[in-house]
Every structure is written in C-alpha cells, then in structure tokens.
Amino acid sequence: MKGLQVAFKQTLGHVVFDIELQLPSKGVSAIFGRSGAGKTSIINVISGLTQPEQGRIALNSDVLFDSVLGINVPVHQRNIGYVFQDSRLFPHYHVEGNLKYGVKQYDAEMFDKVVTLLALQPLLKRYPASLSGGEKQRVAIGRALLSSPKILLMDEPLASLDMPRKKEVLPFLEKLSESFEIPIVYVTHSLQEILRLADHLTVLDRGQIVASGLLSEVWSSQAMRPWQSFSEQSTLFNANIAEQHPQYALTRVMLSSTASLWVQKIDAPLGSDIRLQVRANDVSITLVQPQKTSIRNIIEAKVERVEKRHPAEDKESIAVKLALTQDCFLWATITPWALADLNLKQGDRVFAQIKGVSVTQRDIALTH
C-alpha cells in the first residue's frame, strides 16, 4: 500500500493513544491539536524514538514496526529526516560542516540543490552562533534533506521563531514538497501554517484522531470549530488564476468551472494553482441580486444547510452553507436577526456577496 500507515496503541502518562492513520505518499500532512494532544508522540513513534506497546508502522512497502511480526527497525536504519523545534546544530562546525554531517554518500548535485532551495550559499562558512533563528532552521532542514530520507518529520519547526523569522522561513517550506517527492509530516498548532503548507490535515485530541483527510474537507468540518475563533471560521478553496484586471489591482480566480471571485492582486502567472481562504464573516447574503453596489463579487447560490452556533455565552451566530455549484460550497456567518428577516430555508436561491478587498495576501497560498 502506498503512503504512510500508522496504527498503534500506547499509554503515555495520562494520555491513551489509539491511532489508525493513513497519510499520502507525498505532499505535506499536518498534524494539528492543542498542547499535550500527542502530536509529537506520533512522529516519535514513526521515527522509532518511541516504541509503542502494539501496532504497525509502514512506509509504502517498508514495514518499520510490527508488534505481531516482531519487526522494529532501528532509528538509524529507518531513513527518516527529523527537524526539531530547535535547530540542534553543532556549534563547532560551520554551516557546510553541519549540512554534510551524517551524510552517508556525498552527492554534489544533491548538495547544490538543497543549498539553492534554502538559499544557504551565503551562510556556508558561518558558524551557528552568528546565525538568526530562521537561518538556523533552514540549515537544520537542509541537513535533514541531505540524508536522502524517505520521509521528513517536522516537529513545530517555526514554534521558537518570532513573526519576522517565521515569514522568512515559510516560503522555503512551501517549496519543499514541490522539490522533493517524499511525504512530509508537519506537526503544528498554527492555523496559518496549515493554510500555507498543508495538503492533508489530521486533528488530534488527547491521543485520539478527531478528523483526518484532505485539508479543504477537514478545515470546514465540525472538528475544527473549537480552534477557530469567530473571525477565523472560513472556507478553503483550491482555485486557479484566470484573469488579471487590466486597470485595477485585482485578480479573478476560478473556484470551480463556473464560479469565480475577484480578490486582491496575486503576483503569479495565469493558470497558477492557489489555495484561497474566504472568511465566513466576510460573506453576506441577499435574496435579490443588487444592481448598483461597491461589492465586486455577487455569486448566485443555493442554501444547503443552516446551523446555529454558540461561540460564547453572550453571542449567537448562524452558519449558512451555500452551494455555488454541485461540489463547490461557501460558508457565511450571519446574525439570528438576519436569518429571521430573510427567512432562509434549505433549497432557497440567494446571492452571496464578498468584497474584493476582503481576501488579502494572507488568505492566499500558491500550491505545489
């Protein structure tokens, strides 16, 4: 079977793990959850740093652990790259020495590829003490890649960095899965990192899998509600760039074969694939198509579902799932007053309104 199969049972402290997980053979699979949910424990089991009481771990056709068959491949033979929260560089080696440390067979072409990808050339003769946090993490990622791993495990690699350093490293992480055809398991508690990087998302809580699947599916599911504030509830679209406005700084993106959206200008070629987030509280609903309005996006839709939500004791909101096309949905958040006034019901034909300026660069990521 292709991909990464993780199945194990284990008790660690007060957390009882009962994991059944299938992850794709390439791309970025994010593991998300609150502190103490067991995110790091899962990748430690995959790497072999922790041995479960029972279970099976396999990567494609390679069985790494099987309690029934008595298989437990040692850590150093699993061919796994591991990037920790802290860079763990050797202080007495310069960057080039750190990159080459542990490489079984030096490959000049591979070395140049990694150095170029992570923009490490200016750093090669410098020592870790002179590097910023972001530079250290880029070196740590490079060292892991140069071990020619079959899988890359990343344990919150940006957690120790301040916001400017995170912004420095994120573009390099976005290039990883495009440049290396290996699965990347990425542990994080950051919704923004998930939006920018992940293809697949697993939500974990107290050692149990709450949800696992394609990012766009899990993102809008009930499993994500506890982690999304009122302003963070949103819909994710896999879209592509269809048009650049000749006069204004706006880009039209296709959400489906017929539904499109004008957003703030995206500097990328026509046809580029992107991931797009539309916040639910940026979507309004009208029963009649407006004729003169400043809102650039008026999309005909059908009411698919109406849900009441209680984000706090003193607040109540209504989540409306709108079908733009048969397989393309958009969530809108409205007030109970608006629901009563519009008398919305399943099957009603309505118009969704989204300002062109409401979808900004932070809501858009070029996909692999």
Curated annotation (Swiss-Prot):
Membrane disposition: Peripheral membrane protein
InterPro entries linked: AAA+_ATPase, ABC_transporter-like_ATP-bd, ABC_transporter-like_CS, Mo/tungstate-bd_C_term_dom, ModC_ABC_ATP-bd, Molybdenum_import_ModC, Mop_domain, P-loop_NTPase
Keywords for the protein's UniProt record, in alphabetical order: ATP-binding, Cell inner membrane, Cell membrane, Membrane, Molybdenum, Nucleotide-binding, Translocase, Transport
Primary localization class, coarse: membrane
Enzyme Commission number: 7.3.2.5
Residues involved in ATP binding: G33, R34, S35, G36, A37, G38, K39, T40
Keyword Cytoplasm: no
Recorded GO MF terms: ABC-type molybdate transporter activity; ATP binding; ATP hydrolysis activity
This protein's GO CC annotations: plasma membrane
Record-annotated ABC transporter domain positions: 1-231
Reactions accelerated catalytically: molybdate(out) + ATP + H2O = molybdate(in) + ADP + phosphate + H(+)
UniProt-annotated location(s): Cell inner membrane
Residue ranges occupied by any Mop domain in the UniProt entry: 292-363
Enzyme class: translocase
Subunit annotation: The complex is composed of two ATP-binding proteins (ModC), two transmembrane proteins (ModB) and a solute-binding protein (ModA).
Role this protein plays: Part of the ABC transporter complex ModABC involved in molybdenum import. Responsible for energy coupling to the transport system.
Family to which this protein belongs: Belongs to the ABC transporter superfamily. Molybdate importer (TC 3.A.1.8) family.
UniProt name for this protein: Molybdenum import ATP-binding protein ModC
Organism of this sequence: Vibrio vulnificus (strain CMCP6)
Name of encoding gene: modC
